Amino acid sequence: MASKGREGEHPSVTLFRQYLRIRTVQPEPDYGAAVAFLEERARQLGLGCQKVEVVPGHVVTVLTWPGTNPTLSSILLNSHTDVVPVFKEHWSHDPFEGFKDADGYIYGRGAQDMKCVSIQYLEAVRRLKVEGHHFPRTIHMTFVPDEEVGGHQGMELFVKRPEFQALRAGFALDEGLASPTDAFTVFYSERSPWWLRVTSTGKPGHGSRFIEDTAAEKLHKVINSILAFREKEKQRLQSNQLKPGAVTSVNLTMLEGGVAYNVVPATMSACFDFRVAPDVDLKAFEEQLQSWCQAAGEGVTFEFVQKWMETQVTSTDDSDPWWAAFSGVFKDMKLALELEICPASTDARYIRAAGVPALGFSPMNHTPVLLHDHDERLHEAVFLRGVDIYTQLLSALASVPALPSES
């Protein structure tokens, strides 16, 4: 336990470890403890604090540092408070202890995804306020629930509420991903999650007979069509040295059907997780799914469990004032950026769909990707470097001059 209370530990690291100890783990996150923690941070930093309960027990906490020119749109810094479940037996240390080893690695669920970023936002604001800075644009920090289970009772609802509109967000930052290289990963868009169930109906009967037109035979044809598409996209990814977010992925995740070994089922189903690349014509792709089902035979249908249609791409053109401010910080700090499409889904998709350009960025280079993994961890030096980077980013973004639409 020597890692606790170590003399000389940076206060930002201590705060980070404290936040990691709050058990906001799905499926029963302690959101109340997280909100209380954030309220105390607001009190200490002299920030405005608003709590918006989007559904009972699911609170979006908004901390606000007012700018000097309220006519300008604001900067939105978003992070989620929940974390994914753990298999404690596979961890070297308690995932909710906030343990720091002798080498400076901080272990905990949320160390990379994304409690580190939440504290980096807060500590960057604290540093700027202590130094006496004031900026034209207001900075809002939103801490939202439910992201790890889709954001359906979090950001998806929040962006539809008047409290979100009142923030008048002009530009947003959300989570990114660790990078094992020298470059920092920046997400400017993300793939659309399509979860669907294919259901096949056919003739039932005794398991000893060669029955024609069975549900299994027809479902097999659809599965083959989809997995052939998967292989094609996999080859495109590998042969063209693309990033995962640039192609469409699909995985067969569930198979259901049957009641007994000797009964041919009348119905069988297969579930698929598609992540559709931003450049895909979504209407045409849905028609392709329909054609695969029709080609399999009569009685084959599909239904969506999740279907995201609001694909948005945030500008990374040098003429864009937000991107110019963001990328300019990295040029000044002589840090490399690597632009990517997020291969998974984050709350940034809801923000972009609400008309607010957003980038996904977590300042973790030279760091293995360990989100959702056993022994999720982050080195304290990388974490503190991230506070430095956010300090510069907030200063630049909150100082972007009035846009033509704001004049």
Curated annotation (Swiss-Prot):
Cellular localisation: Cytoplasm
Active-site residue numbers: D82, E147 (proton acceptor)
Residues that coordinate or bind Zn(2+) 2: D113, E148, H372
Modified residues (N-acetylalanine): A2
Transmembrane segments: none
Domain of life: Eukaryota
Entry binding sites for Zn(2+) 1: H80, D113, E175
Keyword Cytoplasm: yes
Pfam hit, one: M20_dimer
Transport among keywords: no
GO terms under cellular component: cytoplasm; extracellular exosome
InterPro entries found in the cross-reference section: Aminoacylase-1_M20A, ArgE/DapE_CS, Bact_exopeptidase_dim_dom, N-acyl_aa_amidohydrolase, Peptidase_M20, Peptidase_M20_dimer
Cofactor binding comment, as recorded: Binds 2 Zn(2+) ions per subunit.
Gene3D superfamilies, per database record: 1.10.150.900, 3.30.70.360, Zn peptidases
Primary localisation category: cytoplasm
GO function term, MF aspect, one: identical protein binding
Cofactors, names only: Zn(2+)
Catalytic activity: an N-acyl-L-amino acid + H2O = an L-alpha-amino acid + a carboxylate; N-acetyl-L-methionine + H2O = L-methionine + acetate; N-acetyl-L-glutamine + H2O = L-glutamine + acetate
GO terms of biological process kind: amino acid metabolic process
EC number: 3.5.1.14
Job of this protein: Catalyzes the hydrolysis of N-acetylated amino acids to acetate and free amino acids.
Protein name (record): Aminoacylase-1
Biological source species: Sus scrofa
